[in-house]
Regions:
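Register position in tetratricopeptide repeats
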Residues: 64, 98, 132, 168, ...
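Conserved structural position within tetratricopeptide repeats
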Residues: 77-80, 110-114, 145-148, 184-188, ...
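Eukaryotic alpha-helical solenoid repeat scaffolds
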Residues: 232, 236-240, 244-388
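TPR alpha-solenoid repeat register
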Residues: 88, 122, 156, 162, ...
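Alpha-helical segment of the N-proximal tetratricopeptide repeat
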Residues: 48-84, 91-98, 165-172
Length: 388
């Protein structure tokens, strides 16, 4: 009985041992299979990530090289490997817009905007797309959202760049007053930067605000008196505004900063004209004798111009000349006063100057633009640089 019991116990132990070994083997096999599966899965995932990066890189390069259609194909492929990658979605939306698929790009960016309404880049792209779609108000709204949105990197610089872009857009659609407001805000937020100040001045000039533009050019020249672009631009604006003396100074200094062969012909002509106008202008700054000499010279030029123009219109219109009124002024005794008489009566000097300027303006309207010194007198008369 004892022998049988021992054999039964031994058989049970062998059975338990065999089952344990089998179970342990199954566990080991399962562990190995799990490890292999995890390895394959991770390898597959890594491979997909690598492929996604490779295709997105191709898309980025295609965008940089100006091939948006190629970029679209590459980026769609990248998204097939990494469907939730936000950076790839942004690039694809950008590529769609660059390729001219405006509606598709707009809708894509709108979907991204729903997730990140404060993203500066997304709002900027939506602003540009809205502008292309001629949705003016939406474009302006998105530009403002981009300005006040979040940016990676130097947000201050990016916001300023967006505000300048908005100003350019406003100028392009004829909304100059709003453009001026944006530019002045950009200027107020700008720590002194020459390139930015010059850009602001150029844009203000384009917007039709020459005084504001000139203030920025002067601001640059206060810090950098020999800044060539500012000297030339300010000189042109002073010339166009009729301040020929200041124009001559600025243009002369600007030209001095340039190599002789680099000076534009228009600048040289403007400089020469400004010098000539300053030399012939009946300014109060010169001596009384010199002023009267200039008045007499200008009167001779204006009278010759009147006589030529009057003969031309009289031949065409007969006795009813449109210059009849100015002609009666020339026929008056005080229109031929000599040097001594003018020196004794400052009022007559000013009256003669007014006759000269009125003659140049009226003859230009009736007989066309004059040439030579008369053309310079016309510029002088329009600017009213003569001082009381």
């Amino acid at each position: 009985m004892t022998v049988e019991t021992d054999e039964l116990s031994s058989a049970k132990r062998r059975l338990i041992f065999r089952d344990a070994v089998t179970f342990l083997g199954l566990i080991l096999v399962t562990a190995v299979l799990l490890a292999i599966t995890l390895f394959l899965f991770r390898s597959f995932t890594a491979h997909r990530a690598e492929l996604a990066q490779r295709w997105s890189g191709r898309g980025q390069n295609a965008l940089n090289q100006g091939h948006p259609e190629e970029a679209i194909v590459a980026l769609r492929t990248a998204l097939s490997y990494a469907p939730d990658e936000n950076s790839y979605e942004l690039l694809l939306a950008q590529a769609l817009g660059d390729a001219g698929h405006l509606d598709e790009s707009y809708n894509y960016f709108l979907g991204l905007w729903d997730a990140e309404p404060g993203n500066g880049f997304i709002n900027l792209r939506l602003a540009r797309l809205a502008a292309k779609k001629r949705d003016t108000q939406a474009a302006i709204n998105y530009y403002h959202a981009a300005i006040y949105g979040t940016w990676e990197g130097d947000g201050t610089v990016r916001r300023r760049e967006v505000r300048l872009e908005l100003a350019r857009y406003l100028i392009s659609i004829g909304n100059s007053s709003s453009a001026r407001s944006e530019l002045l805000i950009a200027g107020g937020n700008n720590p002194y930067d020459v390139s930015v100040e010059l850009t602001l001045a150029d844009l203000l000039q384009q917007a039709g605000y020459p005084k504001d533009a000139l203030n920025y050019y002067r601001k640059v020249l206060t810090q950098e008196p020999k800044n060539e672009p500012a000297l030339l631009a300010a000189g042109r604006m002073e010339y166009e505004g009729g301040n020929f003396e200041e124009a001559h100074r600025l243009l002369e200094e600007g030209v001095a900063e340039m190599h002789e062969g680099d000076v534009p012909a228009g600048i040289n002509m403007m400089l020469a004209n400004a010098a000539h106008i300053v030399a012939m202008a009946p300014s109060e700054k010169v001596s009384p004798d010199e002023r009267v000499e200039r008045i007499l010279h200008a009167r001779s030029l204006a009278k010759t111009r009147f006589d030529e123009c009057n003969a031309q219109v009289s031949a065409a219109n007969g006795p009813t000349s449109p210059l009849q009124s100015i002609g009666s002024r020339w026929a008056a005794e005080d229109a031929s006063l000599g040097r001594k008489a003018l020196l004794k009566d400052h009022t007559e000097e000013d009256a003669t100057v007014k006759l000269i300027f009125d003659t140049e303006v009226q003859t230009s309207q009736i007989c066309g633009a004059p040439t030579g010194d008369n053309a310079l007198l016309l510029l002088l008369s329009k600017s009213q640089t003569v001082e009381p």
